[in-house]
């Protein structure tokens, strides 16, 4: 169900944008997606994708960072693409499966018809 974004959601988007702006590397195609996940405790964790033969999505890196800090319950996640992170993108199939298996109650921020929800 689509819901309007909150100030906390915009803060999460801004963190995903910040991390990709700092780490964007299109020349080597290493880091082109940033993600941020908010735990139910309110902490935000960010990550960038890692290109390799098998790769790792930015969402997976952000979730891994949260788990290594003891977080297990998540509220919301978002991924952005591009040098400035202006494009909000949906999770890939693998990330959707991870979200379903490990955090089924986690909200995903999406862009639908040019509007974020």
Locations of the language-model features?
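Short beta-strand scaffold segments in enzyme catalytic cores
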Residues: 29-39
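Feature captures the catalytic cores and cofactor-binding loops of soluble hydro-lyases/lyases
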Residues: 61, 65-70, 87
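Compact, glycine-rich, soluble single-domain proteins
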Residues: 48-61
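C-terminal binding/interaction regions
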Residues: 1-26, 71-117
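Histidine- and/or cysteine-centered catalytic micro-motif in compact active-site loops
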Residues: 38-40, 49-50
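Hydrophobic "anchor" residues
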Residues: 43-44
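Short, well-ordered amphipathic alpha-helical segments that serve as non-catalytic structural scaffolds
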Residues: 15-19, 58-65
């Amino acid at each position: 169900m689509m819901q309007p974004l909150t100030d906390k959601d915009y803060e999460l988007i801004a963190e995903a944008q910040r991390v990709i702006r700092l780490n964007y590397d299109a020349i080597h195609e290493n880091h082109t997606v940033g993600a941020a996940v908010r735990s139910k405790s309110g902490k935000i964790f960010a990550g960038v994708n890692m290109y390799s033969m098998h790769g790792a999505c930015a969402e997976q890196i952000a979730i891994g960072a949260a788990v290594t800090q003891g977080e297990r319950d998540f509220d919301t996640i978002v991924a952005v693409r591009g040098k400035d992170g202006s494009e909000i993108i949906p999770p890939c199939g693998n990330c959707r499966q991870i979200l379903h298996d490990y955090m089924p109650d986690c909200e995903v921020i999406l862009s639908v018809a040019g509007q974020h929800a």
